[in-house]
């Protein structure tokens, strides 16, 4: 059996419960793939996007729903070693990648703004644009379960809002394009276990700026996301179910208990509903009093 076949087998067999099953759960629960879709699977070269590419390949092979895949790699300015690593891994995993070049690293690193934020925004814009040029209606990104819960906690601690990472969303700048996150229910620890089991090596953040950056979200000691990772790891010792609780909480928001919320860019207050309910109660009370008065006559 070829190396690629063994790797594919590990997804379907050994790590079926950890990888394949939660992947399928996300695809079905959030309706990520529909008949006729042409999906650009966006590959950064890291473990998450490479696994996502293999999962999407397997889904296409075994699904009754017909859809197309394009495996898109944007080169933002990789050095030769990282570029070769991505290409060799794609060859090993038999992923037919389409590569296109941009100057994202150069622009982001010379900006006065947060380079990591700018890099992420520019990357997504280029991916949307290229995917649209190739006739795709969706792009797939490799955000996983842990990204979801960490983003939720970060928004509370540092963003002063309750905000999650949705499993799919419409692009505001590229009409007709949809972003999907097929790894939404897949845990990072299981991705790492699969990578190690198959003795695979992938690139991490390849930006030269992050080597000495203490505030970037690249997994370094100064990262806010890394702080949240450490916090959740510590809390998990006392409450092993804490990650599931956070994940389920964003699926069961009790909106009626919130003093304020925002939807479709509009802010709302609980007073809107409070006043409406009070008016309805007053109306019901008057009707009841009228009925009782009619009975006594």
Can you say where each PLM-predicted feature lies in the sequence?
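ATP-dependent adenylation/nucleotidyltransferase module used to activate substrates
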Residues: 1-154, 158-162, 166, 170, ...
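A structural signal for well-ordered alpha-helical scaffolds and beta->alpha junctions
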Residues: 16, 20, 83, 124, ...
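Alpha-helix boundary/capping detector
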Residues: 49, 82, 116, 153, ...
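Catalytic subdomain that performs nucleotidyl-dependent activation
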Residues: 69, 146-232
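A short glycine-/small-residue-rich loop at the edge of a beta-strand within enzyme catalytic domains
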Residues: 118, 140, 182, 186, ...
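Short, basic, helix/turn surface patches
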Residues: 122-134, 168-174, 229-249
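The feature marks non-catalytic terminal segments
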Residues: 200-297
């Amino acid at each position: 059996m070829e190396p690629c076949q063994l790797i594919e087998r590990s997804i379907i067999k050994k790590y079926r419960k950890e990888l394949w099953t939660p992947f399928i759960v996300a695809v079905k629960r959030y309706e990520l793939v529909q008949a006729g879709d042409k999906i650009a699977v966006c590959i950064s070269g890291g473990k998450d996007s490479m696994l996502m590419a293999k999962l999407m390949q397997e889904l296409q092979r075994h699904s009754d729903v017909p859809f197309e895949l394009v495996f898109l790699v944007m080169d933002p300015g990789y050095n030769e070693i990282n570029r070769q690593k991505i290409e060799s891994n794609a060859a090993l995993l038999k992923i037919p990648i389409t590569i296109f070049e941009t100057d994202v690293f150069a622009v982001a690193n010379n900006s006065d703004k947060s380079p990591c934020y700018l890099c992420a925004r520019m990357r997504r814009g280029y991916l949307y644009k290229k995917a649209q040029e190739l006739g795709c209606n969706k792009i797939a990104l490799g955000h996983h379960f842990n990204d979801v819960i960490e983003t939720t906690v970060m928004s509370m601690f540092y963003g002063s809002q309750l905000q999650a990472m949705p499993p799919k969303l419409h692009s505001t700048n590229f009409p007709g394009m949809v972003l999907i996150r097929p790894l939404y229910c897949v845990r990072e620890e299981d991705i790492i276990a699969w990578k190690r089991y198959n003795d695979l090596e992938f690139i991490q953040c390849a930006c030269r700026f992050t080597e000495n950056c203490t505030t970037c979200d690249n997994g370094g000691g100064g990262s806010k996301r890394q702080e949240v990772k450490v916090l959740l790891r510590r809390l998990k010792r006392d409450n092993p179910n804490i990650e599931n609780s956070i994940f389920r909480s964003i699926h069961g928001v009790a909106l009626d208990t919130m003093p304020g919320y925002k939807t479709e860019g509009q802010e709302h207050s609980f007073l809107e509903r409070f006043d409406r309910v009070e008016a309805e109660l007053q109306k019901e009370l008057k009707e009841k009093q009228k009925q009782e008065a009619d009975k006594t006559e």
